[in-house]
Amino acid sequence: MPVLAVDKPLNLTSHDVVNRARRARGTRRVGHTGTLDPLATGVLVLCVDDSTKVVQFMEHDSKDYLAWVSLGAGTPTLDAEGPVDATAPVPPLDEDHIRGMLTTFCGPQQQIPPQYSAIQLGGQRAYAVARAGGTLELPARNIVIHSLDLLRVYPSVQAAPRMFSATPEGWSPDPQGQAFSLPEPLGEFPTLLLRASVGSGTYLRSLARDLGAALGVPAHLAGLVRTRVGRYDLSGAVSLEDLAEAPGIPDLEALDFPRIQASERLALELRQGKRPRHTAQGRHVVTLEGQLVAVVDGDGEQLKVVRAWA
């Protein structure tokens, strides 16, 4: 069964989309490779039936986003769910200064997740504690931000573009492009339109908070569109209405690792859980006559099976 890239609509949870896919495909075996918040839209990758076996190898794929960051107003959830619980006047914004500041956020970083998140600490979900009026001391996590580009500063999120097209540089404003849905604005606040490429585990809501802090004001994520997950671009994503008939792509094509073309003997040894000698280094996908045999880790001397397929 296939791997599918779905264009998640606004105000649906990732689990809502999984449930719809289960009904559309007639199976309970559907999983996703990375949660997308209800107030975000864009690429949500689903694995169906036997493809659920590859979820663990896709959860760490890098992701691209368009983000609308509104300055001068903070919220408990760090997004447009509201209510606004902190405000401050925003000083004049110089785009060159902001672009220079954004470079300091690129590369390996330490990031504190939002209180309203599914992170579990001491047996408690952070969002459950937050909704009950409490807080958890969430430790900072190691993340990577590959690139962070300021497209433009706008006087408000209402004034910022909503229509975009895919370009070689990434998704860019285009009056003839695809229209994106954003949450209802919480007010008229100066807004940064950003294009971001990040590693797994990065919270764009936390990034919005931290960008505001660097500029000396509260901030929140006023809108978010995920435009890419791994090799899946939004331009190739299907709508919920087309889920039932969407062909998707096979497991083998979904795995974005170098390939090893196996002999019959190598395939048999891997399926038996052995550690055959091989010069490959790092994670690889092993195939035999176009069929998936195993995902392996190589150290330059031998292969260790991470998962094998019969």
UniProtKB/Swiss-Prot annotation:
The active site is at D37. Coiled coil: none annotated. It holds the Pfam family TruB_N. GO terms for molecular function: RNA binding; tRNA pseudouridine(55) synthase activity. GO terms for biological process: mRNA pseudouridine synthesis; tRNA pseudouridine synthesis. Its EC number is 5.4.99.25. Responsible for synthesis of pseudouridine from uracil-55 in the psi GC loop of transfer RNAs. Belongs to the pseudouridine synthase TruB family. Type 1 subfamily. This is tRNA pseudouridine synthase B. It comes from Deinococcus deserti (strain DSM 17065 / CIP 109153 / LMG 22923 / VCD115). The lineage of its organism: Bacteria, Thermotogati, Deinococcota, Deinococci, Deinococcales.
